[in-house]
C-alpha cells in the first residue's frame, strides 16, 4: 500500500499557446499537450480571423472581388491578385499584352522578396536574433515604396487586374527598381553572415521539424515546405504562366527537410527573384498594359476627361461589371508561401457563382502536430516560424 502511494502519478500537462502570443504570428491558438517540456500533441485552433471571404465574393462583381485577395495573405499581396486575375482571364479567354505580363512577373517577384524577408527575419526574431529583423524591414520599406508608386497603396495594391494591370509604371520606376536590385544582393549576404553559420541559429534549426518527402506529399504541402524535403516542384517551372517560360531561374531544393534547409531555400529564392527582376527589366517591351477589349478594360483617365462616352463606359463597367461566360476553372500560382489556387465557377452573370480559395498555409498548419511531436516547447516557436503562416489566408 505504501509502495503504491510512493509511485508518482504521471499526468500530461495541457497548455494554451496564443492567441495573443508574439510568436504565434497572428491569431493562432495552439493547445499543447506536454510531458514535462516535451510536446506530445499540438492541436491548432483556427478561425479567429475568419471573415467569410468566399461568400462575400459571391455578392460582388468580378472586379469588386479583386481587393479581397490582397487581404488574404497580407504579406504577399500581388501574388494572390495574380491567381485571381489569371482565373478570370481563363474564363474570359483573353490574351494579356506582353508588357502587362512582364510587369506582373516583376511585381510578383518583388512580392516574393517582401514575403521571404518577413519570413526569414521574423523567424530569426522568434529564435532570438533581433538584428536581421531590423535590416529586413529597412529593405521591405524600399519595396513597399515601389508598390506605392505603381498603385498608390503600400500594401493592398489591387494593381494586377483581369486583362492586365491597372496602370503603367510611372517614369523612373524601372531605374529605381534596377538600383535596388543591384544593391540588394549584398543585403542578403549581410543577413546570411549573421545567421547561416551562427552556432545558436544552427542549434535551434538543424534537425528540428523534419519532414520527409512522403510526408510532405501526404499532407499536401507546397512551396518551400515541399522543396525543403527534396521535391523540385515549382509551378513557375512545372506549369509556367505569364512569361515565366521565357525567363531563366533555378529552383533551390533541400535535402533533410528540416527548418535549416527551409531557411536556406528562402534565402536562395530571394537571390533567384533578383535574377528574375533583372531579366524582366531588360526584356520588358513597350506597348499597352491592358487587353484591348472595351467590355473588360476601362478607359484611361485621360480619355475620361475628354470624352463623355468614356466616362459613361467607365461608370457602367465599375457599377455593373462585365459578364463572364459559363464555365469553371482551377488556376494556381506559385505564391511565396506555396501553391495558391483559385477555383472559380461562372454562371454567365457578372458575379462569380462560387470562388473557392486554396491557401498553402492551411495545409502547412495541419502538419504542425506531427512536426512538433517529440520536440521541446521552444522548438514549436521555430516550427511555426519555418511554416511561414499568415492567418488571413488560413482562416479566409
Curated annotation (Swiss-Prot):
Signal peptide: none annotated. One of its GO terms (cellular component) is mitochondrion. GO terms for biological process: mitochondrial electron transport, NADH to ubiquinone. Pfam families: Complex1_49kDa. Keywords: Electron transport, Mitochondrion, NAD, Oxidoreductase, Respiratory chain, Translocase, Transport, Ubiquinone. It is found in: Mitochondrion. One of its GO terms (molecular function) is quinone binding. Its EC number is 7.1.1.2. Transmembrane segments: none annotated. Its main location: mitochondrion. It catalyses: a ubiquinone + NADH + 5 H(+)(in) = a ubiquinol + NAD(+) + 4 H(+)(out). PROSITE patterns: COMPLEX1_49K. Core subunit of the mitochondrial membrane respiratory chain NADH dehydrogenase (Complex I) that is believed to belong to the minimal assembly required for catalysis. Complex I functions in the transfer of electrons from NADH to the respiratory chain. The immediate electron acceptor for the enzyme is believed to be ubiquinone. Component of the iron-sulfur (IP) fragment of the enzyme. Component of the iron-sulfur (IP) fragment of the enzyme. NCBIfam families: NuoD (TIGR01962), PRK06075.1 (NF004739). Belongs to the complex I 49 kDa subunit family. This is NADH-ubiquinone oxidoreductase 49 kDa subunit.
Amino acid at each position: 500500500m505504501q509502495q503504491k502511494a510512493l509511485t508518482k502519478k504521471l499526468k500530461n500537462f495541457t497548455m494554451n499557446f496564443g492567441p495573443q502570443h508574439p510568436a504565434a504570428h497572428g491569431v493562432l491558438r495552439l493547445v499543447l499537450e506536454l510531458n514535462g517540456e516535451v510536446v506530445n500533441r499540438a492541436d491548432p485552433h483556427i478561425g479567429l480571423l475568419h471573415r467569410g471571404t468566399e461568400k462575400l465574393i459571391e455578392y460582388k462583381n468580378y472586379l469588386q472581388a479583386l481587393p479581397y485577395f490582397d487581404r488574404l495573405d497580407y504579406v504577399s499581396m500581388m501574388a494572390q491578385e495574380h491567381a485571381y486575375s489569371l482565373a478570370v482571364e481563363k474564363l474570359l479567354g483573353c490574351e494579356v499584352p506582353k508588357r502587362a505580363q512582364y510587369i506582373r512577373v516583376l511585381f510578383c517577384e518583388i512580392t516574393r522578396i517582401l514575403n521571404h524577408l518577413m519570413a526569414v527575419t521574423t523567424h530569426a526574431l522568434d529564435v532570438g536574433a533581433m538584428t536581421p529583423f531590423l535590416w529586413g524591414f529597412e529593405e521591405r520599406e524600399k519595396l513597399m515604396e515601389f508598390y506605392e508608386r505603381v498603385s498608390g497603396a503600400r500594401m493592398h495594391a489591387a494593381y494586377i487586374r483581369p486583362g492586365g494591370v491597372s496602370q503603367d509604371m510611372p517614369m523612373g520606376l524601372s531605374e529605381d527598381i534596377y538600383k535596388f536590385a543591384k544593391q540588394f544582393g549584398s543585403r542578403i549576404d549581410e543577413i546570411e553572415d549573421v545567421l547561416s553559420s551562427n552556432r545558436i541559429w544552427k542549434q535551434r534549426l538543424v534537425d528540428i521539424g523534419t519532414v520527409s518527402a512522403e510526408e510532405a506529399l501526404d499532407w499536401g504541402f507546397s512551396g518551400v515546405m515541399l522543396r525543403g524535403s527534396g521535391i523540385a516542384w515549382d509551378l513557375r517551372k512545372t506549369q509556367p504562366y505569364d512569361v515565366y517560360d521565357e525567363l531563366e531561374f533555378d529552383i533551390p531544393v533541400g535535402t533533410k527537410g528540416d527548418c535549416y534547409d527551409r531557411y536556406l531555400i528562402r534565402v536562395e529564392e530571394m537571390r533567384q527573384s533578383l535574377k528574375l527582376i533583372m531579366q524582366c527589366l531588360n526584356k520588358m517591351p513597350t506597348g499597352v498594359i491592358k487587353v484591348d477589349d472595351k467590355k473588360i478594360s476601362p478607359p484611361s483617365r485621360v480619355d475620361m476627361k475628354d470624352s463623355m462616352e468614356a466616362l459613361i463606359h467607365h461608370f457602367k463597367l465599375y457599377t455593373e461589371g462585365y459578364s463572364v461566360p459559363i464555365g469553371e476553372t482551377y488556376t494556381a500560382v506559385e505564391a511565396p508561401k506555396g501553391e495558391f489556387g483559385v477555383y472559380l465557377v461562372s454562371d454567365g452573370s457578372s458575379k462569380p457563382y462560387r470562388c473557392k480559395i486554396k491557401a498553402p498555409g492551411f495545409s502547412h498548419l495541419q502538419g504542425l502536430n506531427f512536426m512538433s511531436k517529440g520536440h521541446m516547447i521552444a522548438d514549436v516557436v521555430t516550427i511555426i516560424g519555418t511554416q511561414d503562416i499568415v492567418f488571413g489566408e488560413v482562416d479566409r
